[in-house]
């Protein structure tokens, strides 16, 4: 019996010590460092409106249905973060073809002036997460005609807006140039006022 207690005692102490270290101390230290070094990222990269209200995150896309605004990628989960993920069909899957055809049909309804052959792939296909907040600068540019007609904002102004909101590859190496749709639409909204 004494032998069991002598073995159990250090096991309980070690378990309790690691529980406190890994479950309390480590998370508090990491959170403190994150808040001190990169507060914006640690808080979720939130985007605020003029009234200082949170309207979204630059990391999670939103669905814009008003044709006066730029539209992002297709999302099979309607940009619901709790349902992150997408039906990543194989190129040989007929369901992928149906989904892309449906996206193209919806695109044609709002963008009659743009030939389907000029529609960038990111406007008719899902991202892996279904939450992608960015589109390519080309995907933003093909929407300029529609937005210009509906808002009476010149194409030159809209193209400059896209250029101003275009972000380069991460660290100059990873990924491609991209435009955050929410941030772009916020700048567009300022012009609409």
Curated annotation (Swiss-Prot):
UniProt-annotated location(s): Cell membrane
One GO CC term on file: plasma membrane
InterPro entries in alphabetical order: KdpC (IPR003820)
Pfam family, one: KdpC
Transmembrane segments: 14-34
Protein's membrane topology: Single-pass membrane protein
Gene Ontology MF terms in the entry: ATP binding; P-type potassium transmembrane transporter activity
Predominant location category: membrane
Alphabetic keyword roster: ATP-binding, Cell membrane, Ion transport, Membrane, Nucleotide-binding, Potassium, Potassium transport, Transmembrane, Transmembrane helix, Transport
Function in brief: Part of the high-affinity ATP-driven potassium transport (or Kdp) system, which catalyzes the hydrolysis of ATP coupled with the electrogenic transport of potassium into the cytoplasm. This subunit acts as a catalytic chaperone that increases the ATP-binding affinity of the ATP-hydrolyzing subunit KdpB by the formation of a transient KdpB/KdpC/ATP ternary complex.
PANTHER family to which the protein is assigned, alphabetical: POTASSIUM-TRANSPORTING ATPASE C CHAIN, POTASSIUM-TRANSPORTING ATPASE KDPC SUBUNIT
Record family assignment: Belongs to the KdpC family.
Protein name per its UniProtKB record: Potassium-transporting ATPase KdpC subunit
Species annotation: Bacillus cereus (strain G9842)
């Amino acid at each position: 019996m004494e032998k069991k207690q002598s073995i159990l005692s250090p096991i309980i102490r070690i378990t309790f010590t690691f529980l406190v270290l890994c479950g309390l101390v480590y998370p508090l230290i990491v959170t403190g460092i994150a808040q001190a070094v990169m507060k914006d990222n640690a808080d979720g990269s939130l985007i605020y409106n003029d009234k200082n209200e949170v309207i979204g995150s630059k990391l999670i896309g939103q669905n814009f249905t008003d044709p006066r605004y730029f539209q992002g990628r297709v999302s099979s989960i309607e940009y619901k973060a709790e349902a992150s993920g997408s039906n990543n069909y194989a190129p040989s899957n007929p369901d992928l073809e149906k989904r892309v055809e449906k996206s193209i049909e919806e695109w044609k309804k709002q963008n009659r002036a743009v030939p389907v052959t000029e529609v960038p792939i990111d406007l008719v296909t899902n991202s892996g997460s279904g939450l992608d907040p960015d589109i390519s600068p080309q995907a933003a540019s093909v929407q300029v005609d529609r937005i210009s007609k509906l808002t009476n904002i010149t194409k030159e102004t809209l193209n400059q807006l896209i250029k101003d909101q275009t972000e380069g590859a991460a660290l100059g190496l990873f990924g491609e140039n991209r435009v955050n749709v929410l941030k772009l639409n916020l700048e567009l909204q300022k012009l609409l006022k």
